[in-house]
């Protein structure tokens, strides 16, 4: 059970960092 909690926290942190960088700089590659 503890492993699932740590994995969930890790994924959550990575998504927060990803969205922070994604919205801070306007993506040029993602424009389709």
From Swiss-Prot:
InterPro entries, per the entry: PSII_PsbT, PSII_PsbT_sf
GO cellular component, one term: photosystem II reaction center
Keyword Cell division: no
GO annotation, biological process: photosynthesis
Signal peptide: none
Principal location: plastid
Transmembrane segments: 3-23
Keywords: Chloroplast, Membrane, Photosynthesis, Photosystem II, Plastid, Thylakoid, Transmembrane, Transmembrane helix
Subcellular location, record wording: Plastid, Chloroplast thylakoid membrane
Membrane topology term: Single-pass membrane protein
Presence of keyword Plastid: yes
Subunit description: PSII is composed of 1 copy each of membrane proteins PsbA, PsbB, PsbC, PsbD, PsbE, PsbF, PsbH, PsbI, PsbJ, PsbK, PsbL, PsbM, PsbT, PsbY, PsbZ, Psb30/Ycf12, at least 3 peripheral proteins of the oxygen-evolving complex and a large number of cofactors. It forms dimeric complexes.
Function in brief: Found at the monomer-monomer interface of the photosystem II (PS II) dimer, plays a role in assembly and dimerization of PSII. PSII is a light-driven water plastoquinone oxidoreductase, using light energy to abstract electrons from H(2)O, generating a proton gradient subsequently used for ATP formation.
HAMAP family, per database record: PSII_PsbT
Family statement: Belongs to the PsbT family.
Protein name (record): Photosystem II reaction center protein T
Gene coding for it: psbT
């Amino acid at each position: 059970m503890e492993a699932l909690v740590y994995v969930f926290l890790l994924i959550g942190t990575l998504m927060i960092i990803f969205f922070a960088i994604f919205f801070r700089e306007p993506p040029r590659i993602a424009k389709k």
